[in-house]
């Protein structure tokens, strides 16, 4: 799921810290706005906008964090609104609903662990590429 490799250049201490903060921003947003999926995405977008003129290393990791949050946003939003519909509508809890919640929980947990791992290692100046998101980030982020 995660590939560690060399970056185009050796990032400085300040760059590594900013790149690491792009992942920490999403973790802090999870704690602050847990029931609302949009909070996480907005926090990551704001951090990206604040750093879009930053160095290539910082921009690259901001984009990877943003892409991972963007895909989770759709999964979490669907789970959130389905739950609201069950609580306030005339629907009942079904096996499909429970299976979807378990799947969403699993993907959120996996992303949470990967984010912590990436934040720690990016802070050390290592370049971490996530499966799928790393390739997309390479397409979106130009040197």
Where are these regions (language model features)?
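Hydrophobic alpha-helical transmembrane segments in multi-pass membrane proteins
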Residues: 18-41, 64-115
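Membrane-interface extramembranous regions at the lipid-water interface
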Residues: 1-33, 39-66, 119-143
